[in-house]
Amino acid sequence: MVTSASVAFAYTQHQSAFYYAERQAIWMAIGFVALFVLSRIDYRRLRPLAPAGAVAAALLMLLVLVPQLGVTVNGARRWFDAGPLGTFQPSELGKLAFAVYIAHWIDKHSSYIGDFQKTFVPFAAMLAGVLALLMLERDLGTSVVMVAIFVSAYWAGGGRVRHMVLLVAALGLGFVALTLLESYRMARLTAFLNPLADPLGTGFQATQSIYGLASGGWFGVGIGHSIEKYGWLPEAHTDFIFAIVGEETGLVGTTLIMLGFLFFTLRGYRASLRAPDRFGVGLAASITTWIAFEALLNMATVTNTLPITGVPLPFFSYGGTALATTLAAVGVLLNIARSGTGSSLGRSDEAFDRWRRNRRTPVPGNRRRPSVSR
């Protein structure tokens, strides 16, 4: 779909119709290699690398803010120049690095996971630090996804619900404040509430996205025959590729994609339920939530159910770092699923009972249940 959605923009910008498709293919190859390798390596071997990986990701997210190093696009500095591969976005790599680290950290502190001061406060502080870096990059969409990654791992690891409610409420107020303070975010909110009020201005992207989806009908106009991609819909090959999918393949195509993500989500959480240790439970939950939530946000944005967030559609949108990192995360998830207990649906109740017991908040001072492997 990247080839079809980007061909017009690629030719006008780079005089090559396959400029973006070629780079996406290279990143896809890198991603599939990472998927294969990580699906074969025991996921528990990632634990010793978790702290170093998180620190490296944070440093890269900090370095990208340096004017001489980072690349600025549309007023946001989030990328490094990757030469013939296009650009490299550290925050995408950070999703996987922080997912591994937070699952490791929660398992390490599982003996007092319900303690507000010993666990929740440090957890919230780590999340706040990551969000601060993302806000400096002006990346609200990735910030929302990062919250989902952290919170899902915390909940799967046995965190208290009231702590998560408090955290989400505080972050919600923070995001509202940021929206009110930034004029371009207010413009997005206004366009979301009534895109037809200014269809040639702030509501242009949302309006064209809806037109694209509507013109697809049941079966679409055919692959490669989209009209919106010819300069009408901005970011047609990136954040709004779902609208091009809807235009070219119709309701049938978009429904199949949604069902595909639903299937992935169910299988991912099933892998989390059957993971042999708390680290695997948290890691599988965070990876599944990351990809599923990102897809949900993107589709909601394209259909104007939510304001524009700038979140890509996993596996479909153009973006080499995002694609390679997501495929690598799928490799980790496959390894967790392969390591899980039970090989038939009949074991699902047993797996759920074990997961439910693991989520019970340990009494402070009790000895932590050991993981299968360190």
Briefly describe each language-model feature range.
Residues P51-A58, Q117-M135, L140-L180, F192:
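Hydrophobic alpha-helical segments of polytopic membrane proteins
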Residues M1-R138, M299-P314, Y318, A322-L323, ...:
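Membrane-helix boundary/helix-loop-helix interface segments in multi-pass membrane proteins
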Residues I26-A34, E248-T265:
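Hydrophobic alpha-helical transmembrane segments
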Residues G70-T87, H163-I257, A275-L283:
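Hydrophobic, glycine- and aromatic-enriched re-entrant/interface helices and adjoining loop segments
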Residues I106, V144-H163, I227-G253, G310-A324:
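Interfacial segments of multi-pass membrane proteins
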Residues A271-G310, F316:
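Loop-to-helix entry and N-terminal half of a specific, functionally important transmembrane alpha helix
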Residues V33, I41, Y101, V176, ...:
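Transmembrane alpha-helix boundary/anchor motif
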Residues L136, L140, V144, G220, ...:
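Hydrophobic alpha-helical segments of membrane proteins
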